[in-house]
UniProtKB/Swiss-Prot annotation:
Keyword set, alphabetical order: Apoplast, Glycoprotein, Glycosidase, Hydrolase, Secreted, Signal
Catalytic residue list: 192 (proton donor), 262 (nucleophile)
Lineage: Eukaryota, Viridiplantae, Streptophyta, Embryophyta, Tracheophyta
Organism: Oryza sativa subsp. japonica (Rice)
Family indicated by similarity: Belongs to the glycosyl hydrolase 35 family.
E.C. number(s) listed in UniProt: 3.2.1.23
Name this polypeptide is given: Beta-galactosidase 12
SUPFAM superfamilies: (Trans)glycosidases, Galactose-binding domain-like
Length: 911
């Protein structure tokens, strides 16, 4: 056996060596001397027209350890391009001091794109909006005299040009532009200027012309674009941003290609917003409407939104960004959005020759029905897009002598102008739903300690003025928090005689939230919203005879990210009075105010191990405002994404091992009765196996014992498919632009596949007929077939995948039922079979965990295994891992040199 296993190890070592870094595919998309140009039809790479399916992934919104997987997954989704903004305030936090480390390592991110054989679009801006703090503009710009942002204003143009040229040179030095052999094929100057151009009038046109000329003068060798415009200066290409650019946007310059720089895959959300979704069907419909009319580049904004870590989100914007994108906040594929768009990309690319070079024609087939055709008669190639633009009205049209059924608000692709190979409303791919699981590792030692911030008094503050100061000028974007404090004297006849009558403090604020204290007693909280420019804090409070101290902690949920008046946006107390006194209203606005920017915990970095040691901690208590809480937790096993559930808390900040996870605000309840976001992503890259420091700053009231560390899975998969769907993409292929069937059975089928290490445990729902709803919320219709669930159980239970025919006879359905849509809806619950492996390795043979992982994977027959699922410990020469206690062991012992492998498995799997 030893010889047999030794041979397996040797083979595994060879295979592992081939998998080590450096074995990436050679870059072939561009080379030194590549020419990127354009004509009226498309961008051209070395004179060849091409199609570009792009996805927005912003490098600062995910840790570098996630970038490669995100880009690889995007490529699996049929994309060939990744788009990103460049974040000025992240790269130049102080004038002339640049930062390109960690999540802001732009060059590393572009190299990841290059290593995965994809193009890049870089939107330099440098104003970007992006729901990013201050629209990406550094705060210090506001302190430059006479500056007006994004205008024909010399101070702004000087700083803008300096940064643009700095970024361009940095990209050139790294050989990132296509003519240098790099991935960048397109760059953007400015951003959605049409939104504020009306405020700039003639000066706005001058500014745009200057920006275009300045950008072109940098000589990057690839085209520049200006987005959300119908026309752009000179050779700059205007592009569209929006949901339905095929129907809402007109390109005025007919010598330039139709490019779509932002196809919004959902609606970004702010605290207080309810869930906002955009269906896969609507996105696909919009894309094909745009391509039917000649579009050749679409960029999904966002394809992966990621996380607004720390304080990077704009005013009120959720910490989780575009979670409804094709890849969710954690990088997991959101089905059916991911798969339905992947199929669309593959279909169009299969017929790119007819599409890019064919003669275009247009036909009206009826009210709301259109055909857009692309034909190359000499090559016998024909491609047609049949559109039904009517809402709620399915229909059948006659096109070139044949009848075609086209659902409402959908587009069908006819690959040879007669065979339907894709319809935007007919979804084949499975659906999926997320679930959250509290792990044993994180539930242990759930012991919290706390430290409460001191409430400042007027006489101890250093910045004192007659009236309250503007907030941003004090915090300078280094903190969300500014203390305002004032003191005043009351006599006994000032106070109400009745004890049931309490004075009321009224404060008008243009900040985002406020916490009030009177004589150190908590008074209450107040807040605004994204839609309100100000709010009124109005709370009763207890006052006393003598000196009374008022302290208000004003907070900002990010700086505004757009608008022509961005430099003029203010925050803080605008008016303050006390009502309900016997002597009338007391106006405190001119009473004299003290200010303290930032929290003590921020100043001393309480969220780090070093900073934490400067404070006296005590056992945690519930429902204390302005309090820091801390505990330690171990990293959950496996590689599932990790979140922290903050449902038991109210509002504040989260830190893990010194990293700012972001703002939370679970006390801001939507109209639906729940928080906009209650779980917050903790990237595994921020963690170590044991003893992770979790720090919470709670502004209001909360119960830290209820905070949960959880893992995220997509445990429910679904299919929702009709007999009317066209043949699945897997049943045909393109042969020189001609359609070719590759399967004998082209009937409609629903295919359900489990993720790795999962099997089908339960059929939660199954119905054939006219079911309604969505994955996780299906309901049976009036034509429901009672036998459907038993049939699906027989076909699927215990398996890693199953194929379900979508044929009424299989389920005993009554095809004559008046309301039937011949639709199958199935929801399956998956079982998790996670194999936990622990290895004790003697020295000399194995130097890297990655090789150990590959060896074990090959020995055990699980090549998909990754190092996150393994625990590796190097044994000492005299001490063979004494703390290693596997539950079930399989030993392997070799010599020359010695190596010992001890493998521990759980009960789900055996070697």
């Amino acid at each position: 056996m030893a010889a047999r296993v030794a041979a397996a190890v040797a083979a595994a070592l060879l295979a592992a060596a081939l998998l080590l870094p450096g074995a990436a595919a050679e870059w072939t998309l561009t080379k030194k001397g590549t020419v990127v140009s354009y004509d009226e039809r498309s961008l051209m790479i070395d004179g060849k027209r091409d199609l570009f399916f792009s996805g927005a992934i912003h490098y600062p919104r995910s840790p570098p350890e996630m970038w490669d997987k995100l880009v690889k997954t995007a490529k699996m989704g049929g994309l060939n391009t990744i788009e990103t903004y460049v974040f000025w305030n992240g790269h130049e936090p102080e004038p002339g001091k640049y930062y390109f480390e960690g999540r802001f390592d732009l060059i590393r991110f572009l190299n990841v794109i290059k290593d995965n054989d994809m193009y890049a679009i870089v939107r330099i801006g440098p104003f970007i909006q992006a729901e990013w703090n201050h629209g990406g503009l550094p705060y210090w710009l506001r302190e430059i005299g006479h500056i007006i942002f994004r205008a024909n204003n010399e101070p702004f143009k000087r700083e803008m040009e300096k940064f643009v040229r700095f970024i361009v040179q940095k990209l050139k030095d790294a050989e990132m532009f296509a003519p240098q052999g790099g991935p960048i094929i397109l760059s953007q100057i400015e951003n959605e200027y049409g939104n504020i151009k009306k405020d700039r009038k003639v000066e706005g046109d001058k500014y745009l012309e200057w920006a275009a000329e300045m950008a072109i003068s940098t000589g990057i060798g690839v085209p520049w674009v200006m987005c959300k415009q119908s026309i752009a200066p000179g050779e700059v290409i205007p592009t569209c941003n929006g949901r339905h650019c095929g129907d809402t946007w007109t390109l005025l310059d007919k010598n330039k290609p139709r490019l779509w720089t932002e196809n919004w895959t959902a609606q970004f959300r702010t605290f207080g917003d309810q869930l906002a979704q955009r269906s896969a069907e609507d996105i696909a419909y919009a894309v094909l409407r745009f391509f039917a009319k000649g579009g050749t580049l679409v960029n999904y904004y966002m394809y992966h939104g990621g996380t607004n870590f720390g304080r990077t989100g704009a005013s009120y914007v959720l910490t989780g960004y575009y979670d409804e994108a094709p890849m969710d906040e954690y990088g997991m594929c959101k089905e059916p959005k991911f798969g339905h768009l992947r199929d669309l990309h593959n279909v169009i690319k299969s017929y790119h020759k007819a599409f890019l070079w064919g003669k275009q024609s247009f036909e009206i087939l009826g009210h709301g029905y259109e055909a857009h055709n692309y034909e190359l008669p000499e090559d016998k190639l024909c491609l047609s897009f049949l559109s039904n633009n009517n809402t709620g009205e399915d229909g059948t049209v006659v096109f070139r002598g044949e009848k075609f059924y086209v659902p409402s608000r959908s587009v069908s692709i006819l690959a040879d102008c007669k065979t339907v190979v894709y319809n935007t409303k007919r979804v084949f791919v499975q659906h999926s739903e997320r679930s959250f699981h509290t792990t044993d590792e994180t539930s242990k030692n759930n012991v919290w300690e706390m430290y409460s911030e001191a409430i400042p008094k007027f006489r101890k503050t250093k910045v004192r003025t007659k009236q309250p100061l503007e907030q941003y000028n004090q915090t300078k974007d280094t903190s969300d928090y500014l203390w305002y404090t004032t003191s005043f004297r009351l006599e006994s006849d000032d106070l109400p005689f009745r004890r049931d009558i309490r004075p009321v403090i009224q404060i008008k604020s243009t900040a985002h939230a406020m916490i009030g204290f009177a004589n150190d007693a908590f008074v209450g909280t107040g807040r605004g919203s994204k839609r309100e420019k100000s709010f009124v804090f109005e709370k009763p409070m207890d006052l006393r005879v003598g000196i009374n101290h008022i302290a208000m902690l004003s907070s900002s949920m990010g700086m505004k990210d757009s608008g022509g008046e961005l430099v003029e946006v203010k925050g803080g107390i605008q008016d303050c009075v006390v009502q309900g006194l016997n002597t009338g209203t007391l106006d405190l606005q001119g009473n004299g105010w003290g200010h303290k920017a930032r929290l003590e915990g921020e100043d001393k970095e309480i969220y780090t191990e070093k900073g934490m040691a400067q404070f006296q901690w005590k056992p945690a208590e519930n429902d204390l405002p302005i309090t820091w809480y801390k505990r330690y937790f171990d990293e959950p096993d496996g590689d599932d994404p990790i979140v922290v559930d903050m449902s038991s808390m109210s509002k504040g900040m989260i830190y893990v091992n010194g990293e700012g996870i972001g703002r939370y605000w679970t006390s801001f309840i939507t109209l639906a009765g729940h928080p906009s976001q209650s779980v917050y992503h903790i990237p595994r890259a921020f963690l170590k196996p044991k003893g992770n420091l979790l720090i919470i700053f709670e502004e209001e009231l909360g119960k830290p014992g209820g905070i949960l560390i959880q893992t995220v899975r997509r445990d429910d998969i679904c299919v929702f498919i009709s007999e009317h769907n066209p043949a699945q993409i897997k049943t045909w292929e393109s042969d020189g632009g001609q359609i070719k069937l590759i399967a004998e059975d082209t009937s409609t089928r629903g295919t359900l596949n489990c993720p790795p290490k999962r099997t089908i445990q339960e059929v939660v729902f199954a119905s054939f007929g006219n079911p309604e709803g969505a994955c996780g919320n299906f309901t049976a219709g009036t034509c429901h077939t009672p036998d459907a669930k038993a049939i699906v159980e027989k076909e699927c239970l215990g398996k890693e995948s199953c194929v379900l025919p979508v044929v009424n006879t299989v389920y005993g359905a009554d095809i004559n039922c008046p309301a039937t849509t011949a639709t199958l809806a199935v929801q399956l619950l998956l079982a998790s079979h996670v194999m936990r492996i622990a290895i004790c390795v003697r020295p000399m043979l194995f130097a890297r965990n990655g090789i150990v992982t590959s060896v074990l994977a090959h020995i055990l027959g699980h090549p998909e295994w990754d190092r996150k699922s393994l625990r590796v410990k190097m044994a000492g020469r005299q001490n063979p891992c004494p703390d290693f206690t596997p539950t079930k062991s399989y030993g392997y012992l070799f010599s020359k040199p010695l190596v010992a492998l001890t493998v521990s498995l759980d009960s789900n799997l055996s070697p």
